[in-house]
Structure formats: structure tokens, C-alpha cells
UniProtKB/Swiss-Prot annotation:
Glycans are attached at N20, N35, N98, N164, N252. The lineage of its organism: Eukaryota, Metazoa, Chordata, Craniata, Vertebrata. Major thyroid hormone transport protein in serum. Thyroxine binds at N292, K395. It is found in: Secreted. Expressed by the liver and secreted in plasma. This is Thyroxine-binding globulin.
């Protein structure tokens, strides 16, 4: 009889409960500037993000895309801890890691520092990534696995009676609801029979723009071109401010960097008309490094839609196509997790939610806007009134927290 393992990944670009972080845990986190492994991993993780994005683009053409690459990478890396032989190799290779070039211990240490760095308390930036593992109370997980996921991945582990499906479902959904402060309710509507383990991963993010938009200047009913024949009306935020930006003539797109007030930034990428597929196919860690080098600051007359976006994905088929095959098969080897036979991955779900507004993401304390003298000089206009790409990055680790495409900002 097969025993099923769920992997559920939650992503919230909104407020969530912050767990207590001890001083010892914080001070043990190495600075990313001192961690060569973490910098090496940032490129690998970015390329995984774009490869996964392209899979989503094929599976859901002409639709909004939104997900958290770093949370998926961290969850898969944690799962690889309990995998052995080809099951482990396939998971790590799908993430872009070569065990002959970077040993398992270095990979795990790198993810430990990554999670620690992301969870490091920052003033005016709320960012927290967490994991929870719900294990059937009759299952005998290995002590080393439990210690490793607790210490390296800051994972909470719960002993759960999955024989009582409704009670187990309630326990899991209640935990998720608490951790996301009620933003995700009833995440798992129906647990499969014989489920023995559920892995939940979430990342929560709230931040204020370094230069918030004045709500009084938001223009209601502005046109946004979805495709050649479809136009929708959206609230369009407007600001004249200095931003880092560039025109990439090789990729046929305009790139705008909007900083959050502390240690995070958003990249808005506007392909020239008809060039979205070209830009999507070219995105890579090298492109990000090129943009970071070439971005220049200057005055911009900026128009950005105000919108909310969410997306839910069944990652099973996509992960299979990316090379993670044994983990879903009867010959899956999770002997690093338990000596019990027959454990395999049954499902991997991912949900992401984002709110973009005048002040940043989600609710931020009120901001006072001072009257500014009218500027009579003409400045370049950048207007995001058609499909564009959106990346949100954490600065110190250069991690892609969120990656997406806005095709129709009216589809929440």
C-alpha cells in the first residue's frame, strides 16, 4: 500500500505572524557578504526560478503567473535531506546543483544561511520564511532527519493522527491559518487516504516603497492592454520620481527598479509590444547581473497599475518534467527520512498572493505627502499599461522572493 507525502507551499506578499527569534539564532547567522557559497547559490537559484517560470508559461499561456522561487527551492532542498540515491540526485539536479561540483553538505549549509539571512529581523521590512512537517504518529522518522530539518531549515515538526482524516485536515489548516494570520483558510480541502506526511512551506512579506505613491494621484479607469483585442480598466498609480532604469536594446524591453524602504527591491520589466516571449526565453541569472550593472538613476514619469494577484499551482506534473521522477514513483527512496518502506511524494501544491498598492505591499501606516513644486521639465514616461514581468528580490542574498507576469491586473 503506497504511503503518500504532500508538499504544500504557501506564498504571501502580505502580513503574517512573526515567530520569536532568539538572540542566539540571529547572531549565529553568517553575513551573506562572508558566505561565498550563498553567493554561488544565488545564481543557481535564479536560473531555477526562470526555468520554472518558463514551465508555468507553457502550462498557463496568456495568464497571470505568480510564485515564490526561493520557497520552492528551500522546500525541495529540505525534502532532499530525507531522500537517497537517485531520488535525492534528481531533486538536487532539478534545482540546478551538481553534486560533483558542490557537495551535499555545502548545499545544505548554503540553504541554512539563506533561510537564516532571509529571516534575520529587519526594520521596516517584514520577511519570514517557514516550514512545518506533519508526520503520521505511527511513522518512525529518523532522529537525524528531525534534527537536521529543525536546525538547518527552522522547521516545526508535528506528530499527527492521519487515520482521523477530518481531524488531521483541521489541524493542518488551522496551523496554516494561524501562521498566515487568516489570509489562507482551508488550504487542503481533501486529504488523500493513506497520507502519512505533509510538508508545508510559506513565505510572508510586507514592505513599504522607499518612495510611496500619493493615492490622490492614482487615476481610476485607466486602460490596460491585455491582448490585441482586449482592454481592461485599472487604477493607475502615478509618480514623478528618480528611479534606476534602463532600456535593454538586446532584449527589447524597459527595466525599472523600485526600491522598498529596507533591503528589498522590485524589478518591473516591460517588453516592447510583441516581445514578451523573447524576453521570457532570455531571462537568466546573467541577465539580472547585467541589469544590476547597467541600471542608472534618473527622473521618470511613472505609471504603474494598482492590483492584487494570486495563483495556485499543482507542481506535480511540472516537477516530473523538470526531472524529479523517482520521488513520485513506487521506487522512491526516502530512507534518509524513515526506514519504513513505500513512502513517495503524492502531490506538491503552491499558492501565492500579492498586493501592490500606493504604499507598498499590504497595509502600511499612513504616509504624509508634502506639496511639491510643479516640475516643468519633460522626463521619460514609463507606463506599465500592457503585460509586464515582476520580480521582487531580497538585496543581501539577491534571492528572488517572487516572480511573475501580469497579463490582466483585474484578475485577482
Amino acid at each position: 500500500m503506497p504511503l503518500f507525502l504532500y508538499m504544500v507551499l504557501l506564498v504571501l506578499g502580505i502580513h503574517c505572524v512573526q515567530p520569536n527569534i532568539s538572540e542566539g539564532k540571529v547572531t549565529s547567522c553568517l553575513s551573506p557578504q562572508q558566505n561565498a557559497t550563498l553567493h554561488k547559490m544565488s545564481s543557481i537559484n535564479a536560473d531555477f526560478a526562470f526555468n520554472l517560470y518558463r514551465r508555468f508559461a507553457v502550462e498557463t499561456p496568456d495568464q497571470n503567473i505568480f510564485f515564490s522561487p526561493v520557497s520552492i527551492s528551500a522546500a525541495l532542498a529540505m525534502l532532499s535531506f530525507g531522500a537517497c540515491s537517485s531520488t535525492q540526485t534528481q531533486i538536487l539536479e532539478s534545482l540546478g546543483y551538481n553534486l560533483t561540483e558542490m557537495p551535499m553538505a555545502e548545499i545544505q549549509q548554503g540553504f541554512q544561511h539563506l533561510i537564516c539571512s532571509l529571516n534575520f529581523p529587519k526594520k521596516e521590512l517584514e520577511l519570514q520564511m517557514g516550514n512545518a512537517l506533519f508526520i503520521e504518529k505511527q511513522l518512525k522518522p529518523l532522529a537525524k532527519f528531525l534534527d537536521d530539518v529543525k536546525n538547518l531549515y527552522e522547521t516545526e515538526v508535528f506528530s499527527t493522527d492521519f487515520s482521523n482524516v477530518s481531524a488531521a485536515q483541521q489541524e493542518l489548516n488551522s496551523h496554516v491559518e494561524r501562521q498566515t494570520k487568516g489570509k489562507i483558510v482551508g488550504l487542503i480541502p481533501d486529504l488523500k487516504p493513506n497520507t502519512i506526511m505533509v510538508l508545508v512551506n510559506y513565505i510572508c512579506f510586507k514592505a513599504q516603497w522607499a518612495n510611496p505613491f500619493d493615492p490622490s494621484k492614482t487615476e481610476e479607469g485607466s486602460s490596460f492592454l491585455v491582448d490585441k483585442t482586449t482592454t481592461v480598466q485599472v487604477p493607475m498609480m502615478h509618480q514623478m520620481e528618480q528611479y534606476y532604469h534602463l532600456v535593454d536594446t538586446e532584449l527589447n524591453c524597459t527595466v525599472l527598479q523600485m526600491d522598498y524602504s529596507k533591503n528589498a527591491l522590485a524589478l518591473f520589466v516591460l517588453p516592447n509590444e510583441g516581445q514578451m516571449e523573447w524576453v521570457e526565453g532570455a531571462m537568466s541569472s546573467k541577465i539580472l547581473k547585467k541589469w544590476n550593472r547597467l541600471l542608472q538613476k534618473g527622473w521618470i514619469d511613472l505609471f504603474v497599475p494598482k492590483f492584487s494577484m494570486s495563483a495556485t499551482y499543482d507542481l506535480g506534473d511540472i516537477l516530473l518534467k523538470m526531472g524529479i521522477q523517482d520521488a513520485f514513483a513506487d521506487n522512491a527512496d526516502f530512507s534518509g527520512l524513515t526506514k519504513d518502506n513505500g513512502l513517495k511524494l503524492s502531490n506538491a501544491a503552491h499558492k501565492a498572493v500579492l498586493n501592490i498598492g500606493e504604499k507598498g505591499t499590504e497595509a502600511i501606516p499612513e504616509v504624509t505627502f508634502l506639496n511639491q513644486p510643479k516640475i516643468t521639465l519633460l522626463h521619460p514616461i514609463i507606463q506599465f499599461d500592457r503585460s509586464f514581468l515582476l520580480l521582487i528580490l531580497e538585496k543581501s542574498t539577491r534571492s528572488i522572493l517572487f516572480l511573475g507576469k501580469v497579463v490582466d491586473p483585474t484578475e485577482a
